[in-house]
């Protein structure tokens, strides 16, 4: 194990870790079907979405802030409130039109986190497979809002 030789660097790392600290009562988790991968989602006290990931209880993604910035618009990085969480599990097989395999198994657990900030609604959907995970942002239809994709 390497010793941190720069006290300023150690202080910076500590400040970063504390800045994305979550409220323990609002932490949601979803794991892979085999239980090896676990994703934790929470909001900081400032309403910033964060997630972390572990594999066999070892960290693979430290607490990381989520959100994004849109040109000429307010950033979608904080001030959110969690309105609900929906979880589901999928185990299906489908046949590709072409390729090496006749069938592909689609086996994952999903967690959709519903967030709001004022009249803005945003969902973050996590899918966790036995061999990896992903997430995406979804914007449900909203009155008086127009999005261009």
Give short role names for the model-derived ranges.
Residues 2-3, 23-25, 36:
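Bimodal feature
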Residues 27-149:
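N-terminal accessory beta-strand-rich subdomains and adjacent acidic, glycine-rich linkers
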Residues 9-19:
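Bacterial N-terminal signal peptides
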Residues 18-29:
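Bacterial Sec-dependent signal peptides at the C-terminal "C-region" and cleavage site
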């Amino acid at each position: 194990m390497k010793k941190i030789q720069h006290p300023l660097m150690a202080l910076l790392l500590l400040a970063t870790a504390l800045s994305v600290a979550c409220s323990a009562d609002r932490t949601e988790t979803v794991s892979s079907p085999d239980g090896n991968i676990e994703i934790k989602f929470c909001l900081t006290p400032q309403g910033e979405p964060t997630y972390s990931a572990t594999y066999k209880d070892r960290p693979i993604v430290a607490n990381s802030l989520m959100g994004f910035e849109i040109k000429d618009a307010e950033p979608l990085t904080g001030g959110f409130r969690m309105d609900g969480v929906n979880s589901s599990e999928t185990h299906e097989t489908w046949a590709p039109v072409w390729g090496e395999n006749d069938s592909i198994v689609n086996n994952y657990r999903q967690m959709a986190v519903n967030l709001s900030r004022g009249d803005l609604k945003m969902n973050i959907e996590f899918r966790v497979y036995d061999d990896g995970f992903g997430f995406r942002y979804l914007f449900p239809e909203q009155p008086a809002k127009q999005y261009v994709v």
